[in-house]
Amino acid sequence: MWRLNISADELNGSAEVRPPNGNVPAQLYVRLAYLNIPPSSVPDVERLLTEQPSSIPTLDIVVNELTLRGKKLGRLEIDAVNRVGTNAVREWRLNKFNVTLPEATLTANGNWAAEGPRVRRTQLNFVLAIRDSGDLLTRLGTPGAIRYGEGRLEGQVSWQGSPITLHYASMSGKMNLAIEKGQFLKTEPGAARLLGVLNLQALPRRLTLDFSDLFSDGFAFDFVRGDVRIDQGVAFTNNLQMKGVVAGALIEGSADLVRETQKLKVVVVPEINAGTAALYVATINPLIGLTSYLAQMVLSKPLVRAGTSEFQVDGTWADPRVTKVD
């Protein structure tokens, strides 16, 4: 066994290489107080893990303060085994890939496996427990989009590349979102990217309908919930529900994560009353979808149609185009 103590601007801590012991393979054991990986160093880290798999059989890594590409991402814990998986393909089996922040905790596992001679793909099963959506987005580079908001985002997602480099064009998966007690804040067009579409202030700004008393300061919500499917960088939903104290919206459609465009159907409920409250009693089954759900509601509760307005939202995230559907 050898041990190395490290103290530098980029990292501080210790590393050990532990030899095999019975059924326990050799292990790289790392404990760091901090680790800073600037953008220029990310390819080097990925190259090390890709080109030297047999010499690093297992990883046990804890970093108390991780900074990746200039973003402070809190505590990182990795437990990974390099092995030959199914179909005789060598992979990093990620038994633990956890990130802990004051605003949220990511708990994940999965693998990073070769798809071909030069391509490796990350696959993660994850739960993101969110304590403050607004502060989390601020940390990740989107300030002033949301205030508060607690809940969960969980599912499965995969992409070409390493666990530390998201590649939207190859991303696929599915996830469920459930956030409560927050507020989409009033922002300039494009400042919050796709979140700007969910902030219903975009509707009165672009249309003659006067919803300004409801949405002028941003949309305060009791909950935002729904399912999202991602296929090669395009996200789809057919059951997204947003409910506020006096108003709400139902959304289905798609958003291109690479081109930053969308094509959405938005049904606005400017007043939640005895007629429209039924729209939010139950979660919309993704097998049914918003269109069928609304059709059933209109048949059973005719007041629902009278209490809603429908819009098409397309164009770019920075400049969405909103059209009322008569």
What is the predicted function of each stretch?
Residues 3-46, 51-72, 77-79, 89-314:
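Small-residue helix/turn framework positions
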Residues 85-86:
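Short, compositionally biased segments
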Residues 308, 312-326:
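Gram-negative outer-membrane assembly/targeting C-terminal domains
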